[in-house]
């Protein structure tokens, strides 16, 4: 996914799930959704593991997903920085559901980039904007994310 798509997804999820929190919490969540694509350390990790262009593939990012989950488990409430962690977790999980981030993908990095920019981005623009909202998937009845941690 391209950064713009991670941002759109983050903003939609924030609108639906991060209600009644500070604007800073929303900003940190959306930043977490985007930042892994801009963090050079994530690419160095892939290079060190012998997969320089597969850094966000599920088989390489799974340990990071586990690490982020372990930071959040057993929480009674969310602290401000946890929103960034949730955003980063969302980034890796979203990437894991895209074809070029799957270990069965055999295309080149150029094919990967072309797919994300041409095909996937068009789908995200269509479904995460007007069509998604018009279909009734966006509503005000969803439980705010913070309530899951206060039960």
Identify the role of each PLM range.
Residues 1-151:
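N-terminal membrane-targeting hydrophobic helices
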């Amino acid at each position: 996914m391209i950064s713009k798509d991670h941002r759109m997804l983050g903003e939609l999820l924030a609108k639906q799930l991060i209600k009644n929190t500070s604007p800073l919490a929303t900003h940190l969540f959306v930043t977490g959704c985007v930042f892994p694509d801009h963090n050079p350390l994530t690419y160095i990790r892939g290079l060190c593991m012998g997969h320089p262009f597969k850094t966000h593939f599920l088989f390489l990012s799974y340990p990071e997903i586990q690490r982020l989950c372990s930071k959040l488990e057993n929480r009674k409430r969310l602290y401000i920085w946890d929103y960034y962690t949730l955003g980063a977790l969302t980034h890796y999980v979203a990437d894991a559901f895209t074809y070029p981030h799957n270990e069965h993908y055999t295309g080149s990095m150029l094919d990967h980039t072309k797919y994300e920019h041409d095909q996937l981005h068009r789908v995200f623009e269509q479904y995460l904007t007007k069509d998604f909202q018009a279909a009734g998937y966006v509503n005000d009845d969803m439980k705010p994310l913070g309530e899951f941690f206060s039960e």
